Amino acid sequence: MSDTPSSPFIEHPETPRKALFSSNRPSPVRSTHATPSLHGTPSTASRFSRTPREDVIGLKKTISQLRYDLEALKQEQQVAQILQEEKERELEAKHKKELDRAEQAESDQVFLFNKQKELSDENRTLKEELRSLQSQHEADGRELNHELEGLKDLLNDLQSENRALVSEMNYKIEDYEHRIKAASTTTDDLLKEVENRGTALTEAKMNVVKFEQLVESLKGESLDLKQSAKDLEAVEQTKSQLSDQIKYSRELEAKVSALTVRVEAAESAQQLSQVYEEDLSSMKGKLKNMEGLRQQLAEQQLQILVHEENSAKWKAYLEKSDEFKTVEEVVTALNKARMEKASLLERAGSGVNDETRSTAEAYARLQERVTTLESELQLAQNQLKTEKKKVATSIRQHTLAANEAKFLREQLKAYDDEEVTAAGADVKQGRIDELEKLLEAVKNEKSVLEGELKEARSEQGCTVAAGTKRPRADDSVSSEVISEYTRKLQTLQQEFDEVSVEARLLAKTKEALEARLESLEKSQESRVRILELRENPTSRHEAVKQSMLDTLKAENEALMGKNENSKSVPQASLERKQLELQGVRDKLASTEKSYQRLKEVFSVKSLEFREAVYALTGYQIDILRNKKVKVTSMYAQSDEDSFTFLPDPNHKGQFAGVIDSPLTDEFSNIVDYWVKDKKDFPCFLAALNLELYERKENNGNQAS
């Protein structure tokens, strides 16, 4: 029985069986004498030394001991069986729990996969919504930019109104002049009053001196009158009179001091008025000088235009001519031709003698005829030039009038569109009348020019007809005279050839002038766009207003520079600055109001966005200083359990790591794996949420 193996499920070593079979425990049937062993044959000495009764008693004891051991073994076996069954039940429960946990983990994995898929879909939708919000914000930004442009336009309108207000400075200057005159008159009155008050003051001082003498005399008398009680009333009266006189003298001194202050103010005002008058006179002189300079500038511009036209004429002529390249060549050729002509005339004159006086007379007649023809040709060319100029001017004026009429129609249409007030009808009617008068004047000028052109053409026809008449030939000329005539005719033919050359040159100049005229007409039609008359009343009025505005600005700057040291400012400047300040305040209030509205809308939208992010991702995101981001999970035990991410300075919109905290030490394995090794912050946040969720669930199960 000692070889029976012990049960493996018995966890406590101190069992009854082990205590029973321990070698140190003495046997209950062992005596001082030797007893037979259970496993061996007793010796002969021991067997013969004991009696049968003792053997029976010993056997009984061993039997009882064995029964006791058997009962103990049975109990031990029952306890071991109970423990084994309990252990088996615990193992089955643990195995079942592990199976449940594995199934739960499997279901959790499926749930997390589905959840991650849903989160990715929601993240995608959030990104799309974020893009739509960004586009909406961009649209709002564009609308705000449009509003800002509108505000800028409003500011420009206000500035134009401010310029209009500056035009009122002229009236205020006149007001200042009247005020200066009034101030000068008031200063004169004040000076007179000061003189009167000064005389009154001297008289008052004399009276004070007299009263002081009287007081001293009365004091002496009072010493005498102290002994008599009857004169006390007289003394009191004198004292009251003295006090009244002193009060009156003090009042006079106060009035004199006030008058001195007023006199000083009047003197300063008079000085200012003198300064203003000097400035006005200097400004008027400058304005007159400016008018003279403008006239000189206009004359210089006209001279420049004339020189440009002459240079253009020479340029067009030289482009058509193949012989001449510069104006100097043309002048030298002309002088050469004149010299040749003079030499020919001298040679022709030297060949005439007394015998051929009649031939000379005929030659003279022919020469006169040639000269008349040349003069007529020159006159015709001049008339042709003047006619062309008149035609060009009439065409120009006609185009100007047509364009002006077109522009005026458009301007009238614009006036009809912009007419708002009742007074606009009268102004428009006045403008229409002025423009109609101007159009009639242009038409009359056109008709006059056409009449002059017709008269010039008729005169040219008459002169040509008169010049073509030939003198009748003399029948009494002899044959020698005829031969002489033939020689002279040859010379005249040569001269005629030369004249024909000049005529061809003139024809070339005519062609060049016509080409230049065509080019000018084309350039005039293509480049020039006439919007108004040269002497437009509106532009003239605007120029006058602009010049007045410039002078007023200069005067205002000069006056402001002179009044910098004084504490007072002009009333007009103060009112203008107050109006500008009020406009700026209104603009600032409107911008602050719009900014406050945008701020409220942005706060509401940002709160909605944060709530949506918190509901979808499980994290509350807070933006800290220096572009740090604080992230707190919804499964955290407290608000202090959060992570703070550091921004990456090299990459915009990315993070470099996590700031060390007790929570990072607690989840160091997740931080090391996802943040330090993988650099994947979304997976880190997802793993952290899962870990916190499992911890929260385990704490809830343990609490339940």
From Swiss-Prot:
The keyword Nucleus applies. Central component of the spindle assembly checkpoint. It holds the Pfam family MAD. It comes from the Eukaryota. One of its GO terms (cellular component) is kinetochore. It is found in: Nucleus. This is Spindle assembly checkpoint component MAD1. Belongs to the MAD1 family. Residues 21-49 have a biased composition (Polar residues). Residues 53-603 form a coiled coil. InterPro entries: Mad1 (IPR008672). GO terms for biological process: attachment of mitotic spindle microtubules to kinetochore; cell division; mitotic spindle assembly checkpoint signaling. Residues 1-53 are annotated as: Disordered. Keywords: Cell cycle, Cell division, Coiled coil, Mitosis, Nucleus.
